[in-house]
């Protein structure tokens, strides 16, 4: 499974005839059903949604309800001295031409009270770093503010939280919360991709570079948050 095979599944199955099938789309439920099938075979592979088999595609898998996904870190001993990857939302509202996240036309949030409970678990265990893999963490300002305020109010003095954000979406309210953070509590990865307006237009990345610059400068002036800016090599123009 995965993006490398999901979009040319039939071609890959024809090329690699030793494969039984390919998982396409979101894999949590599909993989779970596959494990159960091979552990105690019942029914047929064709009954499992989200597969491409030599005989054809099974039923499409519905998008995952983020609030129903289990918490995977109850045994933190397995992850000692490792980065914890955490997802509080899935999808992205933008349509950037280079990004797979643009395919999912919805943003699905994990229940905020569940998120707070799970973040508190990390805080209680003083893990070194939690890296949010939300594609654009602050695309929903209320969701982002709720999490940032919770971390501000429950900081354990140790744990660092990493977020990927769109700086041009930042509000004054969000910036005011970030200004109060302990140095090292959070770090920000900011997607810029290109400073060429023609390039941004060609890849459907619509934003105000001037506003982005102002936000980055303002966060820099706080002297409490490490930020790094992403650029993509090889884009047009």
Q: What kind of feature is each model-predicted range?
A:
Residues 1-116, 120:
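Acidic, low-complexity intrinsically disordered segments
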Residues 44-46, 160, 227:
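Acidic/polar loop patches that form or flank catalytic/metal-binding clefts of enzymes
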Residues 70-225, 233-235:
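Radical SAM [4Fe-4S] cluster-binding motif and immediate context
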Residues 1, 226-227:
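Short beta-strand/loop segments at the ligand-binding rim of alpha/beta enzyme cores
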């Amino acid at each position: 499974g995965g993006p490398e095979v999901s979009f040319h599944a039939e071609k890959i199955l024809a090329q690699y005839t030793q494969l039984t099938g390919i998982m396409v789309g979101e894999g949590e439920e599909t993989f779970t059903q596959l494990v159960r099938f091979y552990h105690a075979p019942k029914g047929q592979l064709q009954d499992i949604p989200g597969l491409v088999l030599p005989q054809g595609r099974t039923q499409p898998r519905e998008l995952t309800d983020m609030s129903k996904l289990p918490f995977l870190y109850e045994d933190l001993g397995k992850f000692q001295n490792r980065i914890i990857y955490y997802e509080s939302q899935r999808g992205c509202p933008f349509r950037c031409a280079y990004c797979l996240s643009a395919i999912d036309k919805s943003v699905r949030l994990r229940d905020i009270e569940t998120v707070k409970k799970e973040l508190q678990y990390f805080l209680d265990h003083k893990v070194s770093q939690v890296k949010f893999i939300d594609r654009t963490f602050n695309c929903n300002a209320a969701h982002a503010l709720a999490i940032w305020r919770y971390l501000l109010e429950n900081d354990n003095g140790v744990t660092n939280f990493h977020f990927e954000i769109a700086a041009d979406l930042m509000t004054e309210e969000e910036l005011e919360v970030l200004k109060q953070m302990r140095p090292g509590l959070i770090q920000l990865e900011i997607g810029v991709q290109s400073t060429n307006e023609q390039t941004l237009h060609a890849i459907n990345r619509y934003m105000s570079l001037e506003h982005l610059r102002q936000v980055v400068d303002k966060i820099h002036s706080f002297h409490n948050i490490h930020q790094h800016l992403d650029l993509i090599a090889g884009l047009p123009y």
